[in-house]
Curated annotation (Swiss-Prot):
Functional pathway: Aminoacyl-tRNA biosynthesis; selenocysteinyl-tRNA(Sec) biosynthesis; L-seryl-tRNA(Sec) from L-serine and tRNA(Sec): step 1/1
Entry's free-text remark on domains: Consists of two distinct domains, a catalytic core and a N-terminal extension that is involved in tRNA binding.
The species this protein was found in: Thermoplasma volcanium (strain ATCC 51530 / DSM 4299 / JCM 9571 / NBRC 15438 / GSS1)
Job description of the protein: Catalyzes the attachment of serine to tRNA(Ser). Is also able to aminoacylate tRNA(Sec) with serine, to form the misacylated tRNA L-seryl-tRNA(Sec), which will be further converted into selenocysteinyl-tRNA(Sec).
Binding site for ATP: R281, R282, E283, V297, E368, I369, V370, S371
Protein name: Serine--tRNA ligase
Binding residues annotated for L-serine, in chain numbering: T250, S251, E252, E304, T402
Pfam hit, one: Seryl_tRNA_N
Length: 441
């Protein structure tokens, strides 16, 4: 949620911000219309309360003098009825105004590219050595900014679906039979590889000061509304029937809500938390996309970075969580690029977002594996998370980033580390797996 006082004094700034994000500026008009109505009713309400206080004092003085005050008491009763009516009206206006306020997006950072479409995200850097099928060379050079390190290969790598089924480590048919599309069984060494990825990421983040948690996998509506953009996530979230609960789409939402309605001490900040959880997504808006395999699925495991910090430090911490994620993928040997996400693709909460996109040689394209965002005080306002500082209380800033979404990284490893019909395990994971290759079962 944005700062109401800031909005009231910077209407044009927020209108321009909506324009940059592709959001209808009419929501700003709606807010100011409701806000003026709220102010008008509030003035009347305060006037009635003041009149009641004046009348109450006058009645008390009259009673001291032995005067009859029945008429005055009748007037006070009428004022009370008016106050009750105005209080009800102002609550209704507040609810409608707040509903509009929730839809107004966060102010974007000055470094965000002003444009629309993922294809217009700004390439920040490319890292790694890629294998590029000859027909995909132009796509790779364009996606890496023209200077990516790569080698041309004459045969396209097998898809993770074909390779996984040949090696006996992925079973999609059985999962579809019992659960439907976008579910999977992963088996034996591929499962051990997934567990190795999780343990490696947990160790990596623990060594960098993160407290590792497994959060609740369900959140109530109040927490979910405060932590995320329900309008954006309406096609993503699973609602528990007859319960005020939703399955989480990411542990970010549980971790952010963990400190809702709390005051922190300045000395406690920053608070670094790594969430380890299953994630559940309906993917209702992804009809026809990645219908086969384990790249885009309804259930997957993810390690998430989250930081609560002081406002003046948040931009440094955005670079920190991005650097953490990059170090993980450099150590795995997965080629990737970092992009500065453009204004039209940020979502409502983020003031700035970086994506890390790995090169997938079987698909011949870069694809997102990490999103790292600074939500500034927007999420903290929605969840009412403040800290005490000299001179008054202030909202914290919140930041989040994927460390590893396991199914996507399994796909990246299967495509980038194919060797003679088997899968080579990245060196840093061998101590966790206990084996160097995945061969046919």
């Amino acid at each position: 949620m944005i700062d109401v006082k800031l909005l009231r004094s910077n209407r044009e700034l927020f209108e321009k911000n909506c324009e940059y994000r592709g959001v209808d500026k009419a929501i700003i008009d709606q807010f100011f219309k409701l806000d003026e109505e709220w102010r008008s009713v509030n003035r009347e309400l305060n006037g009635q309360r003041a009149e009641k206080n004046r009348m109450t004092r006058a009645i008390a003085e009259s009673l001291k003098r032995g005067k009859i005050v029945s008429n005055e008491k009748d007037r006070v009763e009428l004022i009370n009825e008016k106050i009750v009516s105005l209080e009800k009206k102002i609550r209704e206006i507040e609810e409608e105004r707040d509903r509009v306020l929730w839809t107004i997006p966060n102010l974007i950072h000055e470094s965000v590219p002003i444009c629309f479409g993922d294809e217009n995200n700004k390439i920040v850097r490319y890292v790694g050595h890629a294998k590029v099928y000859r027909d995909d060379e132009e796509e790779f050079l364009k996606g890496s900014g023209g200077n990516g390190d790569y080698e041309v290969i004459d045969e396209r790598p097998k898809s993770h679906v074909d390779l996984g089924q040949e090696l006996g480590i992925i079973d999609l048919e059985s999962a579809a039979k019992i659960s439907g599309a976008r579910f999977y069984f992963i088996k034996n060494r591929l499962l051990k590889l997934e567990m190795a990825l999780e343990n490696y990421a947990v160790d990596f983040l623990s060594q960098r000061g993160f407290t590792v948690v497994e959060p609740p996998y369900m959140l109530n509506l109040e927490s979910m509304r405060g932590a995320t953009d329900l309008e954006t996530f309406k096609d993503t979230l699973y609602k528990i029937e007859d319960e005020d609960l939703y399955l989480i789409a990411t542990s970010e939402h549980s971790i952010a809500s963990m400190l809702s309605n709390e005051f922190l001490e300045e000395k406690e900040l920053p608070i670094r938390v790594a969430g380890v959880s299953a994630c559940f997504r309906r993917e209702a808006g992804a009809h026809g996309k990645d219908t086969k395999g384990i790249f885009r699925v309804h259930q997957f495991n993810k390690i998430e970075q989250f930081i609560f910090c002081k406002p003046e430090d948040s931009w440094d911490y955005l670079e920190e969580i991005l650097s953490n994620a990059e170090e993980i993928y450099r150590s795995l040997g997965i080629p990737y690029r970092v992009v500065n996400v453009c204004s039209g693709e940020l979502g409502r909460l983020a003031a700035k977002k970086y994506d890390i996109e790995a090169w997938f040689p079987a698909q011949g394209k870069f694809r997102e594996i990490v999103s790292a965002s600074n939500d500034t005080d927007y999420q903290a306002r929605s969840l009412n998370i403040k800290y005490r500082k000299s001179g008054g209380n202030e909202f914290v800033h919140t930041l989040n980033s994927t460390a590893i979404a396991t199914t996507r990284i399994l796909v990246a490893i299967m495509e980038n580390f194919q060797e003679d019909g088997r899968i080579r395990i990245p060196d840093v994971l061998v101590p966790y797996t206990g084996f160097q290759y995945i061969d046919k079962e």
